[in-house]
A protein has these predicted regions:
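Cleavable N-terminal export/targeting peptides
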Residues: 1-64
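Short, aromatic- and cysteine-enriched interfacial helices/patches
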Residues: 37-42, 161-163, 216-217
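Outer membrane beta-barrel translocator domains of Type V secretion systems
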Residues: 57-214, 336, 342-343, 347-355
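Outer membrane beta-barrel transmembrane domains
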Residues: 92-110, 149-151, 155, 251-358
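Extracellular/periplasm-exposed beta-strand and loop segments of Gram-negative cell-envelope proteins
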Residues: 106-107, 132, 136-145, 176-204, ...
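Repeated loop/turn-to-beta-strand initiation elements of outer-membrane beta-barrel proteins
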Residues: 124-130, 159-168, 219-222, 274-278, ...
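Extended hydrophobic secondary-structure segments that form protein cores and membrane-embedded regions
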Residues: 168-171, 224-228, 280-282
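Outer-membrane beta-barrel porins/channels
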Residues: 204-216, 223-231, 241-242, 267, ...
């Protein structure tokens, strides 16, 4: 009897153990249904909740976007200088100081330009220099897509002093309506961004020049001079255009850029044989009292951003080769440009002209 009871207890215990194991083992259907994503007793808690989604880091690049405003300031300074260089062509920068009345039609490349300029003797000592042109030019990220330019000046030449004598100029260059596009580029944690802002601008310049001319021979004229300029450039406010990705966009307020220049230069004009004219000119330019009117509001930056343009220096050069094709008619090939560090940089503008002397 005791043995029977012992065997019964052992048998019952084994049966209970087998039943428990079977109950705890998941069925193939439930395992397939779970798909390995069930988590009833995971470390995250026994309530079956899923893991939290990954955290996306914020996009960075606000500092780079604010820094791009400094580049805009450099573009606007370069625009003022290029406008002046193109305007001086209308004032006869590539021609001799003293010559007969003339009119010249011209076209240029490097910066597209087409126009007409000339000079008229008002008295034996006083001459009027004037010209108008339509131009398009670009440099370092900006594009002036349409710009009429006008210029005029008065020159007083002390001809009664003889072949070596002083002369004085006073004049202006103006462009009251320009269409311009400025490029702003910066870098974010998700990649680079580049946007072009479209707006309009106005450019004005006034100058005075004092120099000395010497007709050292019937074929040669040399001159040295000092010029003082003041330039103004007013740019209408605008905002970045709507693009697919520009997380740190900017708004530019209306403002006026200003600079003052002093140029010390010289020139030489020579007649080769009887029908070829040559002129070379150049000078050193120093800017001072520069002021940038650019003020920008940039998303992600505290307050406003305003660049500072320090004093700049560079060289300017020019030249002309003229062929006397008929009595009073001259075909000209000319070039003008700048050489120096940014924001002025190295630029070149060349063209051809047809001049008539009368």
């Amino acid at each position: 009897m005791a043995n029977f009871a012992h065997r019964f207890i052992v048998s019952a215990a084994l049966t209970a153990a087998v039943w428990l194991v079977v109950q705890l083992q998941p069925s193939p259907a439930s395992a397939q249904e779970c798909g390995g994503d069930c988590c009833e007793n995971c470390d995250g808690g026994g309530d079956g909740s899923s893991s939290a989604p990954p955290i996306t880091p914020p996009v960075t690049g606000a500092d780079s976007s604010a820094g791009s405003i400094n580049d805009l300031g450099k573009q606007r300074f370069n625009q003022m200088i290029t406008h002046r260089v193109l305007g001086t062509v209308l004032l006869g920068v590539n021609e001799q100081v003293n010559c007969s009345d003339c009119v010249s039609a011209f076209g240029s490349a490097g910066s597209f330009s087409a126009g007409i300029h000339g000079r008229k003797e008002l008295t034996p000592n006083l001459s009027l220099l004037a010209g108008i042109a339509y131009t398009q030019y670009s440099e370092g990220g900006y594009h002036v897509t349409s710009a009429p330019i006008g210029a005029f000046a008065l020159r007083y030449d002390f001809t009664d002093w003889g072949p070596s004598r002083p002369f004085f100029d006073i004049g202006t260059i103006l462009s009251p309506s320009e269409n311009v596009r400025y490029r702003r580029s910066y870098v974010t944690s998700l990649g680079p961004v580049s946007v072009d802002g479209q707006t309009s601008s106005q450019n004005y310049g006034a100058y005075g020049r004092a120099g000395w001319i010497n007709r050292i021979s019937p074929r040669d004229e040399v001159a040295a001079s000092v010029e003082v300029w003041q330039l103004w450039q007013r740019v209408k406010g605008y905002s970045d255009p709507t693009v697919a990705f520009n997380p740190f966009d900017a708004t530019i307020a209306t403002g006026t850029d200003k600079t003052n220049l002093v140029k010390v230069g010289g020139q030489w004009t020579h007649l080769f044989a009887d029908n070829v004219e040559g002129n070379i000119n150049g000078g050193f330019v120093q800017s001072f009292a520069n002021h940038s009117g650019l003020v920008a509001t940039v998303t992600g930056s505290d307050g406003t951003v305003a660049p500072t343009i320090g004093n700049q220096s560079w060289f300017e050069y020019g030249g002309r080769l003229g062929l006397r094709i008929a009595k009073g008619w001259v075909a000209d090939l000319f070039v003008n440009g700048t050489a120096g560090p940014q924001p002025v940089g190295n630029t070149i503008h060349g063209g051809v002209g047809l001049r008539v002397n009368y």
